[in-house]
Regions:
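Short, flexible loop segments at boundaries between secondary-structure elements
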Residues: 138-151, 155-159, 289-303
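Small-molecule pocket liners
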Residues: 36, 132, 150-151, 159-162
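A broad structural signal for alpha-helix termini and local helix breaks/kinks
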Residues: 49, 139-145, 168, 197
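Contiguous, glycine/small-aliphatic-enriched amphipathic segments in soluble metabolic enzymes
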Residues: 1-134, 176-265, 269-283, 289-292, ...
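A broadly tuned "polar low-complexity/structure-edge" signature
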Residues: 133-140, 164
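Detector for methionine-enriched segments
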Residues: 1, 152-153, 168, 265
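Ligand-binding beta-strand-loop-alpha-helix segment within the catalytic cores
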Residues: 154-184
Length: 340
């Protein structure tokens, strides 16, 4: 059976999304496995230097992918690279919503999202902290083949790191963390490692919140009161979860041999090691959704947009990983008779 194409979203049209989409197509155009279409105003992709062909039927994308970028057209305001405006907010969200619909309806194998500028969207009334939460809302009425999310995971440099908390001030993290949050997030990561990454018996390492994982309570109680009790419950469920590990030694090469993924307690704790090890090739994944979603692990880069300076490494990695996850998920659901 012919593989379904992937679908890319526009992201902010004033950012580097259009440029890296063109560069990703140039790198992948001869590999039909990674065929995609982008949902965008056609003129924006053309302005980034892309050879485009408008399609209405997503299934046509693989047939024309080698010769042109398949574009599913939507309306949009005129846009200048490097000059974002909230007037484009509707185009940005429409691209995301249509991509989600096409993936939920089985037309696309997965969605790959280009970077958005949340502050620009907020000016137009956008009410979600980011892509992760927005996608969770758009798909909330559909079943996932494992525990529902959404959970943010970063992949790169041989690491897979999920986050217990995402976009919040550091001072709020300790107040937000609780046993239930860790249990839910860990269960989703465990399910994703099995379903989306094909790891039969995944090992999950839990990072401590405090320096030296609290040093037996001398530097904080969260490990004793929250993280370790959660780990004990997870182990009773058959999930191979460690007690809280000191985050300063958790990511070196020898430590990485002892786990398949890390559950970090806050945003920078998880993202710094991934971006340090693989700054250009990291991928953002949303776990626990009924659809497969990946994204490049960088922002809109308005300062270099339209200057042919942007690297497409992360988007290319996101496209390849989206295809791999979609294939793994299909295999898992078929083998285990799971409906998604």
């Amino acid at each position: 059976m012919r593989a379904k194409p992937l679908v890319l979203t526009l992201g902010d049209p004033a950012g580097i999304g259009p440029e890296i989409t063109v560069k990703a197509w140039e790198a992948l155009r001869h590999q039909k496995t990674y065929a995609f279409a982008i949902i965008a105003p056609e003129n924006i992709i053309s302005a980034a230097g892309g050879k485009t062909q408008i399609i209405e039927d997503l299934s046509r994308a693989p047939d024309i992918f080698e010769s042109a970028i398949p574009v599913i057209p939507i309306a949009g305001q005129s846009s200048t690279f490097g000059n974002p405006t909230c007037q484009n907010a509707k185009t940005v969200t429409q691209s995301i919503e249509l991509a989600v619909t096409k993936t939920l309806e089985g037309e696309a194998a997965a969605i790959v999202t280009n970077p958005i500028a949340k502050d620009i969207l907020y000016e137009a009334g956008f009410k979600f902290p980011g892509h992760t939460e927005y996608l969770g809302e758009l798909t909330k009425n559909h079943a996932c083949p494992y525990t529902r999310g959404p959970v943010m995971m970063l992949s790169g440099g041989g690491l897979k790191v999920g986050l217990a908390t995402i976009h919040m001030a550091l001072k709020e993290v300790a107040q937000t963390l609780n046993i239930d949050t860790i249990l839910t997030t860990a269960r989703i990561i465990d399910g994703a490692l099995k379903c989306d990454f094909g790891i039969e018996t995944p090992r999950l390492s839990l990072a401590g919140l405090n320096p030296h994982a609290g040093e037996s309570g001398a530097l904080g109680q969260e490990e004793i009161d929250i993280i370790n009790p959660a780990a004990k419950i997870l182990r009773s469920e058959g999930i191979l979860a460690s007690d809280a590990q000191s985050a300063d030694t958790l990511f070196h090469s020898e430590a990485r041999k002892t786990y398949d993924a890390v559950l970090a307690m806050y945003h920078d704790q998880g993202l710094i090691p991934v971006k340090t090890l693989d700054f250009h090739g990291g991928v953002n994944i949303t776990l626990g959704l009924p659809i497969v979603r990946t994204s490049p692990d960088h922002g809109t880069a308005f300062d270099i947009a339209g200057q042919n300076k942007a690297r497409a490494d992360s988007l290319i990695a996101a496209i390849k990983l989206a295809r791999n996850i979609a294939t793994n998920r299909d295999d898992y659901t078929s083998k285990n008779h799971v409906s998604g």
